[in-house]
C-alpha cells in the first residue's frame, strides 16, 4: 500500500502546528509586555493631568485636552484589540485547528488500515471535512480582514495623533517665545519658566508615547504577517489533503496490489512460524518442568526412605549396644558364679586349672555349666551326650574352641574375639 499521495501534507502539518504554537506563545509574551506598557502609560497620563491641573495655563488648553482624549481613546481601542476578542478568537482558532489536525491524523491512520469499500466511505467523509475546512478558512480570512481593518484604523489614529502633537508643539513653542519676550519685563519670570519646562516635558512624553504606539502598530503588522504565513501553510496542508484524496480515488495497479498481498502473506507466514516455534519451546519447557518435578518428588521420597533407614539403623544400634552391655554383665556374673562353684566342688582340680586357664576358658566353663548334658539350644536334632570319663561335661566342647556364644554355643578361637562380639550382637537380637 503506497503512501506517496499526501505525504507533503503529512510533512507540512507538524510544521504548521509548531509555527502556530510559536506564534501563540510569542503573542502571549507580547501581550504581557504591552499590558505593562499600558499600565506605565496610564500612570504617566495621570501624572501629566495632575501637573496640567497645577499649572492652570491659558495657552491652548483645549489642544492638550483633545490630545489626552485622543490618547485615551486610542488606548481603549488598543486594549480591546489586544486583550479582547482578537486574542480569544485566535486562541479558539488555534485550539480548533489543533484538534482538527489530530482528527485528520487519526482518520488517515484508520483509512490506511481499512479495506477498499470502506475507503470510499472515508473519501466521502474527507470531502465533507474538506468543505468544513474551507468554511473555517473563510472564517479565518474574515478574521484576518478584520485585523487588517483595525490595523489601518490604528495607523490613521496614530497619524492624527502625530499631527496633533506637532500642532501642540508649535503652539507651545509660540507660547514659550512670547513668554520669553514678556518675561524680561515680568517680575515672576521664574514661575513661567517652570511652567514652560513642564509643558515641554509633557510634549516630550507625548512624543515618546507616539513612538511607542508606532512600535505597537509595527508589532500588529508583524502579527498580521505571521497570520498570513499561517494561512499559507494551512492552504498547503489543505492542498496536500486534496492530493491525498485524489490518490485514494485512483485505483491501485493490480501488480502493486499483488505485491502488497504477497508481502502481507509472507509476514503472516513468518508470524505463524514464530508462533509454532514458541509453542514448541513452551511444550519443551513444560516437559522439562514436569520431569524436574518428578525427579524432585523421587528425590524427596528417597530422602524420606534414607531417613527412615537411618533412624531404624540407629535404633537397632542402640538396642544392640544395650543388649551387648546386658550380655557383658551376664558374662561377668556367670564368671563369678563359675569360679565360686569350681572352688567349692573341685578344690584340687580347680586350683590346678586356675593357674593355667584364662578368663575366656572360665567363660566357656560357665556356659557349659548353664547347659548341662552337652545339649545346645540352637540345634534341635542333637541328643544329649554323656560326659567324658575322667573329666567334666564341657571338656569336648572346649577342645573345639576357646570361646563360645552363650545363645547358640558356637565356638571361636582366641584370635576371634571381635567376631564373637559381632556374632553375639546378631544372635541375641
Curated annotation (Swiss-Prot):
Q: Where is the composition biased (Basic and acidic residues)?
A: 177-195
Q: Which GO terms describe its molecular function?
A: K63-linked polyubiquitin modification-dependent protein binding; polyubiquitin modification-dependent protein binding; protein kinase binding; zinc ion binding
Q: Where is the composition biased (Low complexity)?
A: 388-397
Identify the stretch(es) annotated as Ubiquitin-binding domain (UBD): 289-347
Which segments does the record annotate as CCHC NOA-type zinc fingers? 397-429
The residues forming a coiled coil are 29-117, 196-226, 255-340
The answer on whether this UniProt entry bears the keyword Signal reads no
| Gene Ontology process terms (BP) | apoptotic process; CD40 signaling pathway; cellular response to lipopolysaccharide; inflammatory response; interleukin-1-mediated signaling pathway; negative regulation of canonical NF-kappaB signal transduction; negative regulation of endothelial cell apoptotic process; positive regulation of B cell activation
Q: How far does the signal peptide extend, from start to end residue?
A: none
Residues annotated as binding Zn(2+) are 405, 408, 423, 427
Question: What does its PTM field state?
Answer: In vitro phosphorylated by CHUK. Ubiquitinated; undergoes 'Lys-48'-linked polyubiquitination probably leading to constitutive proteasomal degradation which can be impaired by IKK-A/CHUK or IKBKB probably involving deubiquitination. Deubiquitinated by USP35; leading to stabilization and inhibition of TNFalpha-induced NF-kappa-B activation.
Where the protein is mainly located, per its record?
cytoplasm
The organism sits in which domain of life? Eukaryota
The cross-references to Pfam families, in alphabetical order and at most eight, read: EABR (PF12180)
Query: Could you say which tissues express the protein in this record?
Result: Ubiquitously expressed in all tissues examined.
Cellular component, GO annotation: cytosol; nucleoplasm
**Which residues are recorded as modified (Phosphoserine)?**
7
**Where is this protein localized, as stated in its record?**
Cytoplasm; Nucleus
Reported function:
Inhibits NF-kappa-B activation by blocking the interaction of RIPK1 with its downstream effector NEMO/IKBKG. Forms a ternary complex with NFKB1 and MAP3K8 but appears to function upstream of MAP3K8 in the TLR4 signaling pathway that regulates MAP3K8 activation. Involved in activation of the MEK/ERK signaling pathway during innate immune response; this function seems to be stimulus- and cell type specific. Required for stability of MAP3K8. Involved in regulation of apoptosis in endothelial cells; promotes TEK agonist-stimulated endothelial survival.
Q: How does it assemble?
A: Interacts with STK11/LKB1, TNFAIP3, IKBKG, NFKB1, MAP3K8, TEK, RIPK1, CHUK, IKBKB and SMARCD1. Interacts with polyubiquitin.
Against PANTHER family, the record matches this protein to: TNFAIP3-INTERACTING PROTEIN 2, TNFAIP3-INTERACTING PROTEIN COILED COIL FAMILY MEMBER
Question: What protein name applies here?
Answer: TNFAIP3-interacting protein 2
Please report the organism this UniProt entry assigns to the protein. Homo sapiens
